Amino acid sequence: MRTHFCGELNKDNIGQTVEIYGWVNRRRDHGGVIFLDMRDKHGIAQVVINPDNADFSLAETVRNEFVLKITGTIIARGEGLTNPKLSTGKIEIKAQNIEILNTSKPVPFQIDATDTSEEVRLRYRYLDLRSDTMQNRLRLRSRVTRYMREFMDEHDFLDIETPFLTKATPEGARDYLVPSRTHSGKFFALPQSPQLFKQLLMMSGFERYYQIVKCFRDEDLRADRQPEFTQLDVETSFMSENEIMTMMEKMTRGLFKLVINVDLGDNFPTITYADSMAKYGLDRPDMRISMQIVSIDKIMQGVDFKVFSGPANYDDSRVAALKVPNGASISRKNIDKYTKYVSIYGAKGLAYIKLNKNGPASPILKFLGDEVIAKVIEMTDAKTGDIIFFGADKSKIVNEALGNLREQLAKDLDLFDTQWAPIWVVDFPMFEVGDDGSLNTTHHPFTAPSVDAKTLEKTATTALSKAYDLVINGSEVGGGSIRIHQIDMQKTVLKLLGISDQEIQDKFGFFLNALEYGCPPHGGMAFGLDRLMMIMTGANSIRDVVAFPKTQTAACLLTDTPTSISRKLLRELSVKINLPEKD
């Protein structure tokens, strides 16, 4: 029977006989004595096996990652032999009995190696998860979800499960579809979120709901996205935006303090979407970076340089400047690198002015004139030694290009403040206008606008929504809104999205019917647990905080999925595969 965990042993246990279980983290032979570093979920303890031990010959066969049961006596390590890197570094276990519970093939990589490729780590994920890093991250994740549940319970929220097999609805990404065997030719969809069901729970009178739930989105993957992801989903009736934000802020503040001992401060600041885009180029501003984007349209409207004057005179375009402190030392080679970087976001170039000791220097000086240059320097508060980058194009392109350049420069030049920086982003546009003039919701079709239905029909392109996002260190960790609770408004929004009456009835009929039976005002929020964990642990990717993640191509290297399905099963599901022809 196990008496202690490896990592819990210390000087207080000296003289005690203990029984431990675990894996061989490392095996060493020194002067005829065998040393084993035994690892379990709490840490590592050193075991020493002397040649006179009856199990010495057995110990000689032991290799890394063998699973052992060891009985022995705790003794103090000799002078000069302690290991300050281990919590157990002042003691060791003098083995009495050794039992091999299981052997191990030679492992394809050292468990705690930092140079192992991600492909190998994911293919042998069960080995990768044995590392201290992954063990600690997943334990932290467990503490986070435990705190969330406790907070929700303390505030009278009910944990209610919602269906995974549900109806396909347009929520901004492609659905994962599940064919129905019993209803030939028909499909379920895996939920992109529990959105409609949690609203139905509010209509059912539960008032406060939460769930830590898996969601599924078939979309292009990035470093911070997975096809299946986990979120804390929250919905509540009879609360305003500010009341919901205050409660969720309280939970976030307590979570960071308890789990990683970070004080996020009281009263998170708030910024409007419009200000965030104007000053930071993105709707998830990283407030650890002091650099701001400055609009310079007015002073560029009359210049002869059409690259600037053109966008400066159009309503949907802008000319903006980004000052980089001490950036004049950036080499031409790196400026070319940044020019290529902003082209990813549609920018056609990256103009700049360096403020050297001898004055401004730039290929564009001759097009602007001294007065305009002086005004730009004044508006950006630039000093000798700085560099000013420019963006001039459609507002969307300029915002994305300079917003992402701002973050990249901060990484390259180490311009981050060390303090954590939470901020609420509010007053989002209700709709985004597509290139073809069609409307798309900025969040989802169930977000309440800040105006009534009649006004919304007239001002759809400028109307704001009652939505809010929580951003920490430039990452959106949560988002929510007040929901539409009146059927006329819901129909108006769906029609503005170009959805026909028949499609509205087919896809949302059940939901619209429920709105007619005394739906309370309600709202909510969802926290992306995976992204939150990435921020709290400092991981580079969500794949590093999920036990069994998918790759960037939505594949699982461990189980070699997705896989083909037998023809027999396809026939049972009434599914026919029609693959596109290869070029």
Swiss-Prot record:
InterPro entries: Aa-tRNA-synt_II, aa-tRNA-synth_II, aa-tRNA-synth_II/BPL/LPL, Asp-tRNA-ligase_1, Asp-tRNA-ligase_1_N, Asp/Asn-tRNA-synth_IIb, AspRS_core, GAD-like_sf. Gene3D superfamilies: Bira Bifunctional Protein, Domain 2, GAD-like domain, Nucleic acid-binding proteins. It is an enzyme of class 6 (ligase). It is found in: Cytoplasm. GO terms for molecular function: aspartate-tRNA ligase activity; aspartate-tRNA(Asn) ligase activity; ATP binding; nucleic acid binding. The keyword Protein biosynthesis applies. HAMAP family: Asp_tRNA_synth_type1. Belongs to the class-II aminoacyl-tRNA synthetase family. Type 1 subfamily. Aspartyl-tRNA synthetase with relaxed tRNA specificity since it is able to aspartylate not only its cognate tRNA(Asp) but also tRNA(Asn). Reaction proceeds in two steps: L-aspartate is first activated by ATP to form Asp-AMP and then transferred to the acceptor end of tRNA(Asp/Asn). Homodimer. This is Aspartate--tRNA(Asp/Asn) ligase. It comes from Ruthia magnifica subsp. Calyptogena magnifica. The gene is aspS.
